[in-house]
A protein has these predicted regions:
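RNase H-like, Mg2+-dependent phosphodiesterase core
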Residues: 1-141
Length: 141
């Protein structure tokens, strides 16, 4: 909530990009084995939240900023985008199950609803109020 969803997505994407570039051995000058590197990214949707987040206070240093392409319904046209969407959803669902096992989050039944707005989840928010992990800017009830 503090940053807004677009900025938070941009920071997360830049963190992932910086980690990937470091793992690949790309140096701070954007070189790999003495040769310049180009990086591309495809975002599923109409908004490039990566480029606008570059060089902001919260953004990590990225040796090679990505050349970003946006594609609405990109998962229909690109296998890599579709695979990334599946990995992201499975990872998020696993995280929600782990969080749901913690006593302070049990009333929200995240182990079952994965944080989506099921009737039980909405009822728990109405009864117990939002948790410290809920986005207050989102319409919760």
């Amino acid at each position: 909530d503090e940053w807004g969803i677009s900025h938070a997505l941009g920071v997360a994407a830049l963190r992932a990009l910086a980690q990937a570039e470091a793992k690949l051995g790309i140096d701070g000058n954007g070189m790999l084995s003495g040769k310049p590197v180009k990086v591309g990214a495809i975002l599923d949707g109409p908004n490039d939240y990566i480029t606008k987040t570059l060089n902001t206070f919260d953004a990590p240093e990225v040796p090679v900023p990505a050349n970003v392409t946006t594609k609405v319904k990109g998962d229909r046209y690109c296998a890599a985008v579709a695979a990334a969407a599946v990995i992201a959803k499975v990872t998020r669902d696993r995280l929600m199950v782990e969080l749901g096992a913690q006593p302070q989050y049990e009333p929200y039944e995240w182990a079952h609803n994965k944080g989506y707005g099921s009737a039980a989840h909405r009822d728990a928010i109405a009864e117990f109020g939002p948790s410290d992990l809920h986005r207050l800017s989102w319409h919760l009830v």
